[in-house]
Swiss-Prot record:
Belongs to the UvrC family. Residues 197-232 form the UVR domain. Residues 15-93 form the GIY-YIG domain. It comes from the Archaea. It comes from Methanosarcina mazei (strain ATCC BAA-159 / DSM 3647 / Goe1 / Go1 / JCM 11833 / OCM 88) (Methanosarcina frisia). GO terms for cellular component: cytoplasm; excinuclease repair complex. PANTHER family: UVRABC SYSTEM PROTEIN C, UVRC/OXIDOREDUCTASE. The UvrABC repair system catalyzes the recognition and processing of DNA lesions. UvrC both incises the 5' and 3' sides of the lesion. The N-terminal half is responsible for the 3' incision and the C-terminal half is responsible for the 5' incision. This is UvrABC system protein C. HAMAP family: UvrC. Interacts with UvrB in an incision complex.
Length: 523
């Protein structure tokens, strides 16, 4: 049963297993959790005073509570994952790596388009999810190119660039009939379902018939399609022979963040490595494992640095369909593997820490700038002016949080006004959504661009350290000082700022180029 209230009524909670949902004043779900004892677990939020930053922020905005009772704790695990997927609460761990497990979607339109989809909802057919993003993307490209399927969201009134380079069959200009396109889609579905050998045999027969009729151009097209499919079949067969029998997981908690790495080992050989960064919170390991193994098949054996709750082990067995061995080794080969993962966490995540520490020192920042956002403006003679924002997290690009901005309020060339607009839009949105601010903001430009951005932050009452970097001599400016900071351009801190600035510039240029190509096609 469930129960909700504008006030959080702890007395209404039972001593039973289930899930609880914290909500804000508008009823939006902020966090979903599971508990062996709902009353004890939820009450603990109000009894503790030394919360971690994430939980403290959650309790600041929590205004309501719902709960759902389950029969067992394993049922609570399953329900928790379902509720997280439904509500996408911002205080739950959202695995950045989740896009690796997207599906390939053929839509249900008259002329179906092919796309990558993270959720298998909507009309059409879904294939996947794929554990390997590389395999998924390769299959997607082979199918798209081989069968010349459309990818556009809305069919344009005239042929696009993809049609002119032979990558699309052009249903938008009636270059292909519904029946002909339908045949292409049928072949694509056959490939995506794994029936590649049957399709190749059928196409080989068709190719011979074309050649016998002296339809050599069509026969050559089929030959190329067959070659692509044969390579795909070989590649897929190799992938499907892999069976991971051990997952080894380790992590480091630092600066209220969890830096976690997962190794997949098959017969002593490392086959895959994945890393994740998310905010530290109580029961973070349990929350991570539930989310990750709800999307991925649990291994025969899971090697971890600390014991897992019995109900979590039962959950893993439920997902896999048989018992999952959980090892917490203290010595021997498995302990060496666990230490190896930890060493990789240290090197992989904190090899960049020296750059962050150098930046903190040179800029006299109050804390390590774990989250850095950088803005750049790009334009071509005042047309197609765009803004870009890149985010670096833990010293690395976090492309999931990159943002693009079409400049709306500025006419002609005005970098000062343009940078003001994108800064205003970015941080007013974060304030509105009650999201955390970055630790440092970087502006690509000199004192003028810096001043424009800083004024917008002041208007919004956003207190985040901000700097700018001028291109000529790579000079770094801060608000209130006429002269640049005494940081040499070949110092570690400056080189790191240049790296971030260059990434923002690259991202803006690519967006600018995309908009100009679209404009040319529409002419």
């Amino acid at each position: 049963m469930g129960r909700g209230s504008k006030m959080i009524d702890l007395e209404a909670l039972p001593h039973l297993p289930g899930c609880y949902l914290f909500k804000d004043e508008e009823g939006i779900v902020l966090y979903v959790g599971k508990a062996k004892d709902l009353k004890k677990r939820v009450s603990s939020y109000f009894q503790k005073r030394d919360h971690d930053p994430k939980t403290a922020s959650l309790m600041q905005f929590a205004r309501g509570l719902d709960f759902i009772v389950t029969n067992t704790e394993v049922e609570a695990f399953l329900l928790e994952n379902t509720l997280i997927k439904k509500h996408w609460p911002r205080y739950n761990i959202m695995l950045k790596d989740s896009k690796r497990y997207a599906c390939i979607h053929l839509t249900g339109e008259k002329f179906p388009r092919i796309r990558i989809a993270r959720k298998n909802t909507g009309e059409g057919e879904f294939f996947g999810p794929f554990v390997s993003a590389r395999e998924r993307d390769y299959i997607f490209e082979v199918v798209r190119k081989t069968f010349q399927l459309r990818t556009c969201r809305k069919m344009p009134s005239r042929a696009c660039l993809r049609y002119h380079i032979g990558a699309c069959s052009g249903p938008c200009i009636s270059s292909v009939s519904v029946e002909e396109y339908g045949e292409k889609v049928k072949k694509a579905i056959s490939v995506l379902k794994g029936n590649i050998r049957e399709l190749i045999e059928s196409m080989e027969t068709e190719m011979k018939e074309m050649a016998a009729k002296q339809m050599f151009e069509q026969a050559m097209e089929l030959r190329d399609e067959i070659a692509a499919l044969e390579y795909l079949q070989e590649k897929q067969n190799m992938e499907r022979q892999k069976k991971y029998d051990e997952d080894i997981l380790n992590y480091i908690v630092r600066d209220n963040n969890v830096y976690l790495m997962l190794f997949k080992v098959y017969k002593g050989t490392l086959e895959d490595k994945q890393d994740f960064v998310f905010a530290f919170g109580e029961d973070f390991l349990e929350e991570f494992l539930v989310q990750y193994y709800s999307e991925n098949d649990p291994p025969e054996e899971l090697i971890v640095p600390e014991p897992l709750d019995e109900s979590l082990v039962e959950f893993l067995a439920h997902v896999k369909g048989k018992k999952v061995k959980v090892a917490v080794p203290k010595q021997g080969d498995k302990k060496e593997l666990l230490d190896l993962v930890l060493k990789n966490v240290e090197i992989g995540f904190f090899g960049d820490r020296k750059k962050l520490e150098a930046l903190q020192s040179k800029l006299s920042l109050p804390k390590i700038p774990n989250v850095i956002e950088c803005f750049d403006i790009s334009h071509l003679s005042g047309t197609a002016t765009v803004g870009s924002m890149v985010q670096f997290r833990g010293g690395r690009p976090d492309k999931h949080n990159y943002r693009r901005f079409k400049i709306e309020s500025v006419e002609g060339i005005d970098d000062f006004a343009s940078i003001a607009e994108v800064v205003r839009r970015r941080y007013s949105r974060l304030l509105e959504d009650k999201h955390e601010m970055p630790d440092l903001i970087i502006i690509d430009g000199g004192k003028g661009q810096l001043s424009s951005a800083f004024q917008e932050l002041r208007k919004l009452r956003v207190k985040v350290p901000i700097i700018s970097i001028a291109k000529r001599e790579e000079e770094i400016y801060v608000p209130g000082l006429k002269s640049p900071l005494p940081i040499k351009k070949d110092e570690k801190a400056s080189l790191f700022v240049q790296e971030i600035r260059d990434e923002a510039h690259r991202f803006a240029i690519n967006y600018n180029r995309l908009l100009r190509q679209k404009a040319l096609i529409q002419k």
